[in-house]
Amino acid sequence: MELIASLIVVPVVAALLLLVIKNDRARDAIAIAFAALIAVLSIAFAVVFAGPGTYEFALPAEWGHPLSLVNLAIDLTVAIFVVCYAVRYKRPFALGLAALQIVVALWFEFAVQAGAEFSMTMRVDALGVIMVLIIGIVGSGICVYALGYMKDFQAHELHENPQARDRRPWFFAIMFAFLSAMFNIVLVDNMAWMYTAWEVTTLCSFLLIGFTKSEEAINNAFRQIVMNLLGGVAFQFSLVYLGVFGLPLSFSMFVELGAAFPALVMLPVTLLAFAGITKAAQMPFHTWLLGAMVAPTPTSALLHSSTMVKAGVFLLVKLSPIFAVSLVPSVMVVLVGGLTFALCSFMAISQSNAKRVLAYSTIANLGLITACAGVGTPEAVWAAILLIIFHAVAKSLLFLCVGTAEHHIGSRNIEDMDLLFERMPRLARFMMLGIMCMFVAPFGMLIAKWATLVSFVETGNVALIILLAFGSAATFMFWAKWLGKLSGIAGEPQNVEL
């Protein structure tokens, strides 16, 4: 239990310290120290809880009511933040959704759950261990990379506007708070507390995407928050349904009940699946993740690899035992995921902006994970988990490489990366490694897609197999194109007309 508490509390402490410290050297030292500590804690967590089986840790019953009030306070704080920003920037839709969340949160606490026991249990399983490693190692690594990147970013801001305020303390505080919220999502068993962490990630993403405060950044930040608030409202109403009908708020008990009596939980499962689809940026909600590319590169890397979108597919994978026996939500999830994978893979071919290629690739791979979760068989679930692991590692590397290349060559356009192997050989090698990890044998993504194909074949669903085949062909095309741009080497000019 101490390890779990440390994983949740340590990033919060780091966020608070980084929020008040203005000195560059002190900020660097604290961020690196806490990032290293989070990574070490994640590895220690994996060592302790590795292996089959699940572990549950319940907090004392007398903590239930205070924790319930803390939970409500965080819910209201997040919603009020959104209301304030929506009023400031005159966004009525975001204002309406946030106001609705406030009303539902109060109703749920003081009417639906009035007098009910608030049980706070932490649950660790194999998927939770994998997610902790991804969040703790990849996420903290991105935070360290952001130190150098944001120094250059601030220097550029000062060059453009000598009066520009240094907002890096906010940036790093939000980054570390993001990690804490993600640890909450993957480790907590209480669905009300999971919802709270879910909405915290939505707010953190909003603040990071709109960090530059340009008109484009603000528009894309509100697009993100509106789409994810729709999912948040769906999540809330699933909790209300469970409370009204006396069904368990324990996620593990809910999944067991749904697997045994799928008709009983069809509505809340469908609502939760909708929440997962919006968070995972699946069509037609994919545009918020494309818009997130206006944010600084560390934000893009964090959103795509270890946080936010991974929360969406994590929820869907956790619900997979119910999808395996419940036709309606299963068909919805499989259809959305399969079409997203195929269509976004083809959309990526037409892109020359490296970050947009990575964004479409991320959405496509999340679609494949979503489809696997919707199938719900053990083979499909393990294929989804493999995709989550290998995609997180490769995509974080690629985003960081693209950000570094943009700083040095002044462009993120793939067409401008000709002869990058000669100009920046070390960076080009890392970028090529990341690209090959996405589609070349013997790297993990190819193995994961093979596992996906096997699981789809076993379902007998021909449409799924066709979508996988066409999407994979498109994937090969845009990665091979990018790889070719990087690997070109200039030679001596030769007259071929002689």
Spans of features found by a protein language model:
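Transmembrane helix-loop-helix hairpins at membrane boundaries of multipass inner-membrane proteins
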Residues: 2-6, 13-173, 246-260, 287, ...
